[in-house]
Amino acid sequence: MITPMTTATIATLPITLSPQAEVVAKKRYFLKNDDNEIVEKAPDMFRRVADAIAAVEKQYGKLDIDVRLTSNEFYTIMSNLDFIPNSPTLMNAGTEQGTLSACFVLPLEDSMEGIMKAAHDTAMVQKFGGGTGFALS
């Protein structure tokens, strides 16, 4: 639990991922540079995600200190492995992509153009970790 004394960024908490989780995180979740080199570790990823999620609070009039407290609380529960968000959130929060949803229902029009648009949209959603379904009604 975050106390009112925790107004600054929490120091990096020790995070122990299983060997399997470390492999998956390196392959799918950690940010990479233009040379495809990993540029963050688990604490960095959790901070990136926590800061991005908490930043939304500013849109609803929250003070900077409240945003920081929310970020720290979210960072703590992730670091303790009490809660881990879905894959698109881990991959995209705090990046230009920003898609956090995991599931999308796409329209499918009964024409060649509509089918090809659905195929394109499906590929783009899946590129960023989302799953797709189609509205056939």
What is each residue range found by the language model?
Residues 1-137:
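Extended catalytic cores of very large enzyme megasubunits
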